[in-house]
């Protein structure tokens, strides 16, 4: 099975383990990720201004490239997934935005939202199947109590992302069970870590990330996993929690369970 793949900027520098473990794991599971040629930064955040076109053109270009290959587009970084998914929705359902974007792009074939954008976790759940992931595990993570941290961008806005219930998600907990770990459910797992506020007011990010960390520790989690490099940064660098849990990318645990982590 082949899928086009948009890694995003951070996975090429600060979050290389998220990318490397993802590729190795899917190879073991019989899925090939074909990285897009000459992709560009998605912008990192989806502007809610309806007349803001320029910042979204790189995402449109990536979506059109996957369409031209005839492949679904897989994403991994929560922020990239959010931007690409919302841009795709705008191209499919908002005529004025789509017309303006296509006018700028001057593509041979105008893009109208034809590409299906799926997150890596959705690929594991809906294409590979968590049962097949479980069958491929050679190093089950038994005894590891892991808290899944969703954050804001992976699930919201729910009507567009359509990955899981944004208020009571289960996809990461089901993933953790498939690799043999014990998922720990805690209230703040889909609350904001502080996000980009860290660039303007670190105190906000510290307050938010500390609340997440304390809540997970209180519920007896031994570690956290996330799909978001920014969340991983805030939880690791800005939390002032008394108990500082280690924070891993979910693909690191997947690669360990499948026996493909160096």
Which role does the model predict for each range below?
Residues 1-262:
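Iron-sulfur cluster-binding electron-transfer modules in prokaryotic oxidoreductases
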């Amino acid at each position: 099975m082949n899928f086009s793949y948009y890694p995003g900027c951070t996975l090429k520098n600060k979050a290389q383990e998220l990318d490397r473990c993802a590729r190795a794991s899917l190879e073991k599971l019989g899925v090939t990720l074909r990285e897009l040629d000459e992709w560009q930064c998605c912008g990192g955040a989806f502007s809610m201004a309806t007349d803001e076109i320029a910042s979204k053109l790189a995402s449109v270009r990536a979506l059109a490239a996957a369409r031209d290959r005839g492949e679904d587009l897989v994403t991994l970084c929560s922020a990239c997934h959010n931007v690409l998914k919302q841009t795709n929705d705008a191209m499919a359902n908002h005529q004025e935005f789509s017309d303006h974007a296509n006018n700028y792009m001057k593509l041979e074939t105008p893009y109208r939202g034809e590409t299906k954008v799926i997150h890596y976790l959705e690929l594991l759940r809906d294409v590979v199947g968590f049962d097949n992931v479980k069958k491929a595990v050679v190093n089950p993570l038994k005894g590891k109590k892991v808290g899944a941290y969703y954050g804001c961008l992976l699930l919201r806005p729910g009507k567009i992302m359509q990955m899981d219930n944004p208020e009571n998600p289960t996809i990461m907990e089901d993933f953790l069970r498939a690799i043999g770990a014990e998922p720990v459910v805690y209230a703040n797992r889909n609350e904001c870590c502080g996000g980009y506020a860290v660039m303007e007011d670190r105190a906000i990010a510290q307050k938010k990330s500390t609340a997440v960390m304390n809540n997970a520790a209180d519920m007896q989690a031994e570690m956290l996993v996330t799909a978001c490099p920014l969340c991983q940064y805030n939880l690791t660098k800005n939390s002032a929690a008394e108990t500082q849990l280690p924070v891993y990318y979910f693909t690191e645990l997947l690669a360990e369970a499948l026996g493909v982590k160096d």
